[in-house]
Design a protein with these regions (language model features):
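Contiguous, small/hydrophobic- and glycine-enriched helical/loop subdomains that border
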Residues: 35-77
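Generic non-transmembrane alpha-helical segments
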Residues: 7-11, 15, 61-69, 131, ...
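A contiguous pocket-lining binding segment that forms or flanks enzyme active sites
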Residues: 72-125
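Short amphipathic alpha-helical segments
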Residues: 4, 50-58, 162-166
Length: 169
């Protein structure tokens, strides 16, 4: 949907990433070895039918995995791929949640920033949009990404943490 997406994709490739179109979620994210992508699939029931209820299951799971952090769910508008169910600590986004309704079930997917250079990820997404959008026609449906609006679990916990350790939680 961006008029100059080829230029944006070129920028992503220059940074040694492979562009992929996701089947859920709204806007772009960066996936690398410091990011954990989690999918939570469950059957569609009367209890789980609401969109918010499905999101709340993932929020609860994440809060239980990290009781030492005050994880809240609300939109961080200056992050990349902002949404109502951004997970944040102290106003900085650590995760984004999307969902997809499937035949007899629900798939809730989360992008969780575990470790690595989150500022560089944010800068790359900002550069992607700067290259992909028409500068003469501003489009407010894309975020003006502030790389400082996002943070890793490793930074918050003030200790090294690996993706495998997060999986065990």
């Amino acid at each position: 949907r961006t008029p100059f997406v080829e230029k944006g994709i070129k920028k992503i490739i220059e940074h040694s990433y492979v562009p992929v179109i996701r089947n859920s979620g709204g806007l772009g994210v960066i996936a690398d070895e410091g990011i954990l992508n989690i999918s939570y699939l469950f059957p569609k029931t009367a209890d789980s039918a609401s969109t918010d209820h499905a999101y709340e299951k993932m929020v609860s799971l994440t809060q239980q995995a990290f009781p030492e952090l005050q994880i809240e769910a609300y939109e961080i508008a200056s992050s990349y791929c902002p949404g109502t169910y951004d997970l944040s600590v102290n106003g900085q986004k650590i995760a984004g949640i999307a969902q997809r309704r499937i035949k007899k079930g629900i798939a809730v997917m989360m992008y969780l920033s575990v470790n690595g250079n989150q500022t560089a990820r944010g800068n790359l997404v900002r550069e992607f949009y700067q290259q992909s959008l028409d500068p003469l026609r501003p489009d407010n449906s894309y975020p003006s990404v502030d790389p400082n609006s996002m943070v890793t679990l490793e930074t918050l916990l003030e200790r090294p943490i690996l993706v495998n350790e997060v999986k065990e939680r």
